[in-house]
Structure formats: structure tokens, C-alpha cells
Swiss-Prot record:
Top enzyme class: transferase
Organism: Methanocaldococcus jannaschii (strain ATCC 43067 / DSM 2661 / JAL-1 / JCM 10045 / NBRC 100440)
Source taxon at top rank: Archaea
Segment forming the signal sequence: none
Protein family: Belongs to the archaeal 6-HMPDK family.
Required cofactor(s): Mg(2+)
Keyword ATP-binding among UniProt keywords: yes
Molecular-function GO terms, alphabetical: 2-amino-4-hydroxy-6-hydroxymethyldihydropteridine diphosphokinase activity; ATP binding; kinase activity; magnesium ion binding; thiamine diphosphokinase activity
Matches recorded under InterPro entries: HMPDK_MptE, MptE-like, TPK_catalytic_sf
The protein, known as: 6-hydroxymethyl-7,8-dihydropterin pyrophosphokinase
Amino acid sequence: MDMKEWEIFYNKIMEDFGFDKDKDVESAVILNNILENANTIPVDKLKDIIEGREVFIFGAGPSIKKHINILKELREINYKNPIIVADGACKAFLEENIIPDIIVSDLDGDLEALFECNRKGSIIVVHAHGDNIEKIKKYVPKLKNVVGSCQIPNYKELNLRNVINFGGFTDGDRCCFLAYHFKAKKLILGGMDFGIYITKYSRPNIKEDIAIGDEIKIKKLEYAKTLINYLKDKIEIEFLK
């Protein structure tokens, strides 16, 4: 994504939520430094998986299990379509014995499921922001096949060689921006509901399978919808029904 365009979104998001830009920078620098010595993979590996293909992208919304069943039927026809999932959605895939090709995570989902998928071959795109610094320090050194991402627009000016800003704000829409960055042919979206309801996959601490999200979560989903709508003019996007 063009960083000048992203900076407009980024500034609005930071102001709207009252987030600390300096913390975002700190987090990006820490992740970049950890990845100097961690089990990273070349970014071109993502390109090999995504470029020119129709890509399935899954959030962790209430429709996730319904859409995984549709995915199973579609993949019987074409098994080569890669799967990219947002963070906690990987647990729903594990329950169906499917290992995503790529998981985009800021490390606030089900970490046990994330690590299991990673052990079984999933690439983890770990995202740095101001609220997950301690999780980055604790968990990233234990992962393998890692790619780093950040949300600060000026990451190149800071000479951060091990993180990339693909664009995107939530794990779900970041999956879409990642696929767009690596020139996917088409995005096929599942588990992307953008409503007021959330699942245990996106918030492991809730007691019910589905619950009403808090105000912050709902606002984040609204931004996710806005950002995905922005991409509609740039790449073909289909929502599973």
C-alpha cells in the first residue's frame, strides 16, 4: 500500500482511538530487532504462495464455521487456493483439521492454537503495535517461519529491515492488504461479519461461543470494513454467503 495513503488512515485511527504513535514505533523497533535472530523466512515466500492466485481469507466472525464448510467444498475443486486467516480464526481451522498457509496475528488470539498451526507449517505474520510489546518479547522468539509487520508509515526511514507495513488495522483486514500487496488474483472472504457480535475465536476470554462485542471491538470492526471497502477498487473481492 502507498504509505502516503496509509498515513491518512493511520492518523485518523490513532486520533480516534487515542493510541500512542511512539509506542507503535517502539513495538516495531523491538520486533525488528528480535527478528534479526529469530526463525524468519524470506518475504518472497509469501509472494510464492499468493501471487496470481485466488486466496481465501478468514476472519473470526460468527459465520466462520459455516464458511469453513463452504471452503471445504470449494477446495475439493481447487485444492491449491491458499488460506490466510486472522489470528484466533486458526483455532476454528484446527478444529476442522485444516492448517492455514498464513496466519496474521498481533498475538491476542488463542496462542496454543497459533503455536500448533505454526508447528504444523503455518507461516506467522506477527504484527507490532503499541499494545503488544510484552507479547512480542515473550512469544516471537519461540515461533518459526515468521514475517514481521508494523503499522507505522515511516518504517523505511527508520531502517527497519525485518518488518513491513502492508497496510491494514485489524488482523482481518491486514490479511486482505497482505494478499493485495503480493498480487493475489482475487480475495474470497469468510468469517467477516463486521457486526456487533464476536466469537470465542477472536476473544478467547468470553464465556459464550458468541457475544456482543465491546465498544472498542465494534469500532475496530467498522474500520476493518472501511479498509476492505477501500481495497474493492483495487482487487476483486468476494464475500462467502
